[in-house]
Amino acid sequence: MNKAAIFGAGGPIGRFVGLELDRRGIPFRAVGRTASKLTDAFGKLPHAEVVAADLSDAGGAAQAARGVDTIIYTLGVTYTEFPLYPKLMRVAMDAAASAGVARFLLVTGVYSYGVPQTQRVAETHPRNPVAVKGQLRKEQEDLLMAAGERGLFKTMIVRLPDFYGPYADTSLANPVFRAALAGKTANWIGPVSTLHEFLFVPDAGPVIVELASRDDCYGEAWNFAGADAITTLAFIQKIYQAAGRQPKFRTAGRTMLRVLGWFNPLMRELPEMLYLQETPVLLDDEKLRSKLGGAHKTTYDDGIRQTLEWMRRHPS
């Protein structure tokens, strides 16, 4: 990997991928929509080039892909914009092919797997999405894998669970930390008794960059699981205890979400995804750990402590 481009570098995964590339001395282009956000994240890094571009536009994507050999695609959209995922992938792949990019890595989540058929979900688990958003994510994956099969470039998919941590305030978990620090009641979607897993977002950067650096890891999908299986209730309790507060939270179920959806477009998108909170979706990353000789995972106690410390320094 001589030079990489991070598509979606303004997000939390992209930020920590960029920090790891810089740590390794690998030149990279940080691409996102907002120049000020990118400059804040990467402007002082010696190996970073900041490019503000509209990645839904062919010209913007072409500018972003020019002169790099590897694209690490971490671009995300809101729930109300999910139909854009396949379109954005087509634009990025066209740009990559035209620019002669050699490798294209997609970072995604667990939606394409659907409801688990096994206790742990390995890369060989069938992809049978049960939600429209899962179907759109599967379509995105299929487009990339088909490009790899056609020989346009080498491809890879890395799947992550829900994450939390510094700069991840758009995640499901981070608002709970904010509520705990303020002594307020946290909101959660769905039941809290189900086993879940969470990834401390800084842990993702080194793993993604290591995979991207290895030619023998392409042509495959890789799971990177969270620190451990934990009930959402236990996770929330740990957050409040670390903040020195008594746990306070409320949950919204399917009926409440449908009512809220009458007034809020985002809430309208949530009921179909409740299966992720009602059924344990726990990744099996034995293949990845075996390939890389292990992978560092920050414990929940340590990750929660670091996240609270970061939020105290970044109160908004």
Identify the residue ranges that each predicted region occupies.
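Active-site Tyr-X1-5-Lys
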Residues: 130-157
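Conserved Rossmann-fold NAD(P)-dependent oxidoreductase catalytic core, especially the SDR/UDP-sugar
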Residues: 90-136
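NAD(P)H-binding glycine-rich loop region in Rossmannoid oxidoreductase-like domains
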Residues: 36-99
